[in-house]
Amino acid sequence: MSPVATESMYKPTTINQTAHQQAMDPLKSKQQSNATVNKPAFKPEPAVNLTPIKFAPIKEHQVQRAMVRRYFQDMEERAISDVIIVGAGSAGLSCAYALGTARPDLKITILESNVAPGGGCWLGGQLMSAMVCRKPADEFLDQVGVPYEDEGNFVVVKHAALFTSTVLSKVLAMPNVKMFNATACEDLIIKPCPINPGVQRIAGCVTNWTLVSLNHDHQSCMDPSTITAPLVCSFAGHDGPFGAFCVKRVASAGLSEGLGDMRPLDMERAEDHIANKTREILPGLIVGGMELSEFDGSARMGPTFGAMLLSGKRAAEVALQSLDRVKIEEGEVVGLAK
């Protein structure tokens, strides 16, 4: 029996209905449009006076060997480091810059769990671009060579990425600095302190590729690697899968009274605390940046970066004093310096 014709069967198709049909069946709509629409052919203007580009010949195995050789040479060389910096955000990079500039003889190794270093310093607050730094952090920007606009008590870098890319490029250009990104610190090396009996000392980092660290629940027997160092400077931040990792680990190991947990936002109190309280919380472990707020229970500062920069710089100063006090053999503290 034939269906009864209704008025709706004879209504013309609207533009909205056509768009809906195309969304439901894009392949069919594309075939129909190709059959009914005559598109004008695009004729690009011919390129004039452009020199042909011809790359030098290469074999795939050459690329592989060039990458593998350098990466594992770096791993072998940095199996013993002078300083490990955990976290390549604004505080960690500032520490690396200050430390590498002051002591080009030190082997500084940076561990960054993300593929892209920089932490939260590619943008300002709420995904906006400007970077606000309260004075006197402008002095550090001058040292690094980052331009800014002076607003009186604070300065503004036009885009946070300008600071991050500038300090990152200068840090990575230092011959004494090596960075392993996409590499997580998933534990700490902790040994009895040879200086203070009964006290434990941080003696390096346990590392793994981040994708492996994040998948231990899915596959067993993925053992890590290690880097030995007399000093670890941790700037692991306060969020993300590895946020505040080192202070959480020493708390779980029973080496601290626990975490203070970060308090709500108060810019003035927060920045003063973070910049001035950056310190060696345990023998061999200096903590700064937002990780320190999780340890001390201080306020968060929000989208102002001055304390991050000066916390990193302060950590470098503390690190140099700490290293000068101890005698080191094969990356391990064996006693006090004479």
Swiss-Prot record:
<dbReference type="GO" id="GO:0160205">
    <property type="term" value="F:cysteine-dependent adenosine diphosphate thiazole synthase activity"/>
</dbReference>
<dbReference type="GO" id="GO:0052837">
    <property type="term" value="P:thiazole biosynthetic process"/>
</dbReference>
<dbReference type="GO" id="GO:0005829">
    <property type="term" value="C:cytosol"/>
</dbReference>
<feature type="binding site">
    <location>
        <position position="238"/>
    </location>
    <ligand>
        <name>substrate</name>
    </ligand>
</feature>
<protein>
    <recommendedName>
        <fullName>Thiamine thiazole synthase</fullName>
        <ecNumber>2.4.2.60</ecNumber>
    </recommendedName>
</protein>
<dbReference type="Pfam" id="PF01946">
    <property type="entry name" value="Thi4"/>
</dbReference>
<feature type="binding site">
    <location>
        <position position="185"/>
    </location>
    <ligand>
        <name>substrate</name>
    </ligand>
</feature>
<feature type="binding site">
    <location>
        <position position="91"/>
    </location>
    <ligand>
        <name>substrate</name>
    </ligand>
</feature>
<feature type="binding site">
    <location>
        <position position="223"/>
    </location>
    <ligand>
        <name>substrate</name>
    </ligand>
</feature>
<comment type="function">
    <text>Involved in biosynthesis of the thiamine precursor thiazole. Catalyzes the conversion of NAD and glycine to adenosine diphosphate 5-(2-hydroxyethyl)-4-methylthiazole-2-carboxylic acid (ADT), an adenylated thiazole intermediate. The reaction includes an iron-dependent sulfide transfer from a conserved cysteine residue of the protein to a thiazole intermediate. The enzyme can only undergo a single turnover, which suggests it is a suicide enzyme. May have additional roles in adaptation to various stress conditions and in DNA damage tolerance.</text>
</comment>
<keyword id="KW-0963">Cytoplasm</keyword>
<feature type="modified residue" description="2,3-didehydroalanine (Cys)">
    <location>
        <position position="221"/>
    </location>
</feature>
<feature type="binding site">
    <location>
        <begin position="112"/>
        <end position="113"/>
    </location>
    <ligand>
        <name>substrate</name>
    </ligand>
</feature>
<keyword id="KW-0408">Iron</keyword>
<feature type="binding site">
    <location>
        <begin position="300"/>
        <end position="302"/>
    </location>
    <ligand>
        <name>substrate</name>
    </ligand>
</feature>
<keyword id="KW-0784">Thiamine biosynthesis</keyword>
<dbReference type="InterPro" id="IPR036188">
    <property type="entry name" value="FAD/NAD-bd_sf"/>
</dbReference>
<keyword id="KW-0520">NAD</keyword>
<dbReference type="GO" id="GO:0009228">
    <property type="term" value="P:thiamine biosynthetic process"/>
</dbReference>
<dbReference type="InterPro" id="IPR002922">
    <property type="entry name" value="Thi4_fam"/>
</dbReference>
<comment type="similarity">
    <text>Belongs to the THI4 family.</text>
</comment>
<dbReference type="GO" id="GO:0005506">
    <property type="term" value="F:iron ion binding"/>
</dbReference>
<keyword id="KW-0479">Metal-binding</keyword>
<dbReference type="GO" id="GO:0005634">
    <property type="term" value="C:nucleus"/>
</dbReference>
<feature type="binding site">
    <location>
        <position position="120"/>
    </location>
    <ligand>
        <name>substrate</name>
    </ligand>
</feature>
<feature type="compositionally biased region" description="Polar residues">
    <location>
        <begin position="11"/>
        <end position="21"/>
    </location>
</feature>
<dbReference type="InterPro" id="IPR027495">
    <property type="entry name" value="Sti35"/>
</dbReference>
<keyword id="KW-0539">Nucleus</keyword>
<feature type="binding site">
    <location>
        <position position="290"/>
    </location>
    <ligand>
        <name>substrate</name>
    </ligand>
</feature>
<feature type="region of interest" description="Disordered">
    <location>
        <begin position="1"/>
        <end position="43"/>
    </location>
</feature>
<comment type="subunit">
    <text>Homooctamer.</text>
</comment>
<keyword id="KW-0808">Transferase</keyword>
